[in-house]
């Protein structure tokens, strides 16, 4: 089993549990150059809020889009957008990535901005 398939297996297991519980999810995805975050409805078919370093508004605020500073900005923005839609409680779906570095920074910034998980 290679690294990518192991990550996808971990993500599938976590998503299965969240789907059974019927909770709103804060889903992240990271690449070496960008980080993405979405708040997905419990039914899994609707994106309630989203933010990523691809957006011009966010990429203008940071020098480089693939570091912790960029992840913190994305976490803050996605939390603000979710709160504007009335979503306060979410489950953190790290998509099989380790809770370390940019993933942890995004989560901490979202918590500081008002999301609870």
Swiss-Prot record:
GO terms for molecular function: 5S rRNA binding; structural constituent of ribosome. Signal peptide: none annotated. Keywords: Ribonucleoprotein, Ribosomal protein, RNA-binding, rRNA-binding. One of its GO terms (biological process) is translation. One of its GO terms (cellular component) is cytosolic large ribosomal subunit. Pfam families: Ribosomal_L18p. InterPro entries: Ribosomal_uL18_bac-type, Ribosomal_uL18_bac/euk. Belongs to the universal ribosomal protein uL18 family. This is one of the proteins that bind and probably mediate the attachment of the 5S RNA into the large ribosomal subunit, where it forms part of the central protuberance. Part of the 50S ribosomal subunit; part of the 5S rRNA/L5/L18/L25 subcomplex. Contacts the 5S and 23S rRNAs. This is Large ribosomal subunit protein uL18. It comes from Pasteurella multocida (strain Pm70).
């Amino acid at each position: 089993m290679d690294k990518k398939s192991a990550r996808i297996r971990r993500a599938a297991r976590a998503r299965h549990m969240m789907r059974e519980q019927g909770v709103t999810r804060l889903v992240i995805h990271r690449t070496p150059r960008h980080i993405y975050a979405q708040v997905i409805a419990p039914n899994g078919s609707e994106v309630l809020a989203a933010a990523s370093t691809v957006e011009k508004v966010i990429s203008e605020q940071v020098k480089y889009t693939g570091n912790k500073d960029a992840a913190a900005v994305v976490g803050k923005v996605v939390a603000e957008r979710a709160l504007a839609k009335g979503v306060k409680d979410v489950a953190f779906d790290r998509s099989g990535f380790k809770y370390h570095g940019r993933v942890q920074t995004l989560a901490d910034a979202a918590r500081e901005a008002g999301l609870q998980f």
